[in-house]
Amino acid sequence: MTAIIELNNLSVQFHQKGRLVTAVKDATLHIEKGDIYGVIGYSGAGKSTLVRTINLLQKPTKGQIVINGEKIFDSENPVKFTGAKLREFRQKIGMIFQHFNLLSEKTVFNNVAFALQHSQIEDKNGKKRYLTKKEKTDKVTELLKLVDLEELSDKYPAQLSGGQKQRVAIARALANDPEILISDEGTSALDPKTTNQILDLLKSLHEKLGITVVLITHEMQVVKEIANKVAVMQNGEIIEQNSLIDIFAQPKEALTKQFIETTSSVNRFIASLSRTELLAQLADDEELIHLDYSGSELEDPVVSDITKKFDVTTNIFYGNVELLQGQPFGSLVLTLKGSSEHRAAAKAYFVERHLKFEVLGKIERTVD
């Protein structure tokens, strides 16, 4: 599939307090039409700076940007992309933020309508004209229905919850029928329940409109819920990028692994084991194993196989299965009991089956 967004070898530098700061360094990111692409990193990683180059809210220092096949920036061969052309281009890229940026003195309806004040369409002769009042009214009504706010059209921002305010912001961002929607920490000011509701809305809009979504966040759970691809940023660089499934199945960088651990209940379970009476001590012929598996591996009776093949016994203390992009991912924490040779054979079987596992060892009880 063709990339709708191509950021090639981008760097962004600026002067701050008398020194040169590199916010983004040689970043390359290609996003295909229809992707929900998560860009994750801690504060200061450069993720917002990078993504804001997509609509030239942030001008790069060097590199190249191609949007929907059109080159809009090239440090080697400068492109004239200013004025009316730039404004028209930006209308096709919607954007929502952590702080909703609504106009407090305007109603929900008029906040959305505000985005249409300079909107134009082509008439039957191919000439551009501004929307009529009726066309604007119809458009706003349609958008409010799309985000489930039609009954709140005459309310003011002060009368809305955080989630409702973000829905208004989303409707406004969609006013000019953008092909790309950028969410810059769009859920970070919301509680977990409202965050899930907004993510569900974004997924629904993605399915209904076919819009490409670029999601900036510092929360891997947000990426896990909605994205199909992920880029991880650190110190201005993209250190890892892949499909969501491959990132979770085979993370390469330490930071990526840290982010994944924040979403995993198995890690919390493992951390709690040191205070568990039941596992205060393991026998000499026992090992504690953490096993991860996915996809078709879940269909195979791996635990049953090793007990039959290698004369070991198991005791499962934790099990979990969840879906990522429709593909099941599972984790087990279990004891493996048997002679050292039989346990080694069982672990070799895990390797043969391409299963990820780690030996957690003996669990010594800690004292508070």
UniProtKB/Swiss-Prot annotation:
Similarity comment: Belongs to the ABC transporter superfamily. Methionine importer (TC 3.A.1.24) family.
Topology term for the membrane: Peripheral membrane protein
Reaction catalysis annotation: L-methionine(out) + ATP + H2O = L-methionine(in) + ADP + phosphate + H(+); D-methionine(out) + ATP + H2O = D-methionine(in) + ADP + phosphate + H(+)
EC number: 7.4.2.11
Localization terms from the record: Cell membrane
Name of the protein in its database record: Methionine import ATP-binding protein MetN
Residue ranges annotated for the ABC transporter domain, each copy included: 5-260
Entry keyword Aminoacyl-tRNA synthetase: no
GO molecular function: ABC-type D-methionine transporter activity; ATP binding; ATP hydrolysis activity
Gene name, Swiss-Prot/TrEMBL: metN
Organism: Lactococcus lactis subsp. lactis (strain IL1403)
A GO cellular component entry from the record: plasma membrane
Ligand binding (ATP): 41-48
Function comment: Part of the ABC transporter complex MetNIQ involved in methionine import. Responsible for energy coupling to the transport system.
The keyword ATP-binding appears for this protein: yes
UniProtKB keywords: Amino-acid transport, ATP-binding, Cell membrane, Membrane, Nucleotide-binding, Translocase, Transport
Subunit structure: The complex is composed of two ATP-binding proteins (MetN), two transmembrane proteins (MetI) and a solute-binding protein (MetQ).
